[in-house]
Amino acid sequence: MIANERIKIRINQLEMMYPDSFHEMSEEKKAGLVFYKDSPGACLEDPEHHIIVTVGWTKPGIMAMMLNEKEAAKAAEKKISRPMAAHGYHLEEFSDTVLGGVKASGYRYHYHIQDTDMTGETLVVKYKKVFYYLNFYARTGLLEESFKIWHLILDTIVFEE
């Protein structure tokens, strides 16, 4: 399934581990990602399993500070749904979970790009006035195995002081 070795990464106060089959995505590949900006965080890929995971964080402005993780997830979904419509974007569901002992909200969706059916999931966590955005992208045909790997990563998340 996945390699036994795990690599630890810290993004602001979020710490997580990922399998050694992942590596930091090149700047050239990052530039091709529509919604990945130069925000602080990490952009990881596992070419063997065709998975991309991005993790970023932002300190929101005064108005956005009033949002909770569920409202921030809905705002993020609204932001991507219009431009992704050209790629057959379809929202599957909104959901809630817990990551590292902190409430998280997110959404799962499907789209089609470069002749490939894809599934994405975004999870939003608000921890100490900072929003963390965790994004997962995988080929829909490989989803069962990909979700196992994604959830192994999510299960390692802790928030440090």
Task: Enumerate the language-model features and the residues they cover.
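N-terminal targeting sequences that direct proteins away from the cytosol to non-cytosolic compartments
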Residues: 1-50, 58-67, 75-103, 110-118, ...
